[in-house]
């Protein structure tokens, strides 16, 4: 959890209120058996202030790795690149991974989120946007690191996409 205030003169941002950013992230995993793992996550980021947010602060959603392209990027299944989002963004994710052979795994993953121009409107369906994404993946654990391929879809892209990865994420 973090909170930041952005100004351009220690008091204001562009002759308006300073920009406040509240950011919360939580991720956990558990293994009910030696071959099955459940990973769950929750991300939330809320901006408040003048409403004219610079690119370096504005919320971004998409990709598989948090903060890969911009520090404020929140991962989302089915959106394969970082996209701009509104001022209030909440995302929950779930990944079910099963080991099928010694070094081979399959995954089923999903994300659900809501975004809105203001935090107090995020549960109001007329003022916010529902986001949903699903995916399936295969991973091989090689001696050089994991090799992964994923097929995914979201109601934001409205098409099947894919992601391929090789190596560890640091």
Residue positions per predicted region:
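Outer-membrane beta-barrel "beta-signal"
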Residues: 138-145, 149, 158-170
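C-terminal outer-membrane beta-barrel translocator/porin domains of Gram-negative envelope proteins
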Residues: 1-101
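Structured core elements
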Residues: 91-93, 107-109, 148
């Amino acid at each position: 959890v973090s909170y930041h205030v952005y100004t351009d003169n220690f008091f204001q941002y562009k002759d308006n209120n300073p920009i406040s950013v509240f950011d919360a992230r939580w991720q956990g995993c558990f293994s009910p058996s030696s071959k099955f793992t459940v990973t769950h996550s929750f991300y939330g980021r809320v901006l408040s202030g003048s409403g004219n947010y610079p690119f370096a602060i504005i919320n971004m959603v998409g990709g598989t790795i948090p903060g890969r392209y911009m520090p404020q990027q929140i991962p989302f299944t089915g959106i394969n690149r970082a996209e701009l989002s509104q001022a209030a963004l909440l995302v929950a994710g779930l990944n079910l991974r099963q080991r099928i052979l010694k070094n081979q795994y399959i995954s089923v993953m999903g994300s659900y989120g809501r975004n809105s121009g203001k935090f107090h409107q995020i549960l109001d369906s007329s003022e916010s946007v529902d986001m949903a994404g699903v995916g399936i993946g295969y991973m091989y654990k090689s001696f050089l690191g994991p090799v992964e391929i994923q097929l995914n879809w979201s109601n934001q892209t409205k098409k099947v996409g894919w992601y391929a990865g090789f190596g560890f994420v640091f």
